Amino acid sequence: MTKSKVKISKKMAEAEVRTFLEAHYIDVDTEDMEKEEASETNAIIAALARPIQKGRATIDGKKYTLELLEPQGDLKEVSFEGMSFHALTHSSRAKAGDNMAMEGQVVAAMCKITYAELCKMPIQDFMVLNNLKKVFMSA
């Protein structure tokens, strides 16, 4: 586990992300993937590792915790412990044809926060959480 506010190398952070994803039964062996899929997987792993490198995120077993850039009252961090069917069904609550709202509903549900809380986050925080959604949805 990476301790908060401790900066680590890119390689170590990416290794933590790979271990986290493997713990959730997500294949991260890019040697067996098509070139385009491997490139996309590596880009997502790098994006998820960046907050770890900067000490803003931690991984503890099967839990990824992101410290928010702009805390919202008591909400100072958001944790993700895996994707559930419940998170997927949240997208149906969004208006038909509004892809961003559908993605936001899924991200909010997977992090167990409200859609309103998600909407108040800086785009940088949303993009980290959206990358988690992408990798879990593609599994």
Task: Name these PLM-found stretches.
Residues M1-E77, G82-R93, A116, M121-A139:
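Charged interaction scaffolds used for protein-protein
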Residues H86-M110:
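A hydrophobic, small-residue-rich beta->alpha segment in the mid-to-C-terminal subdomain
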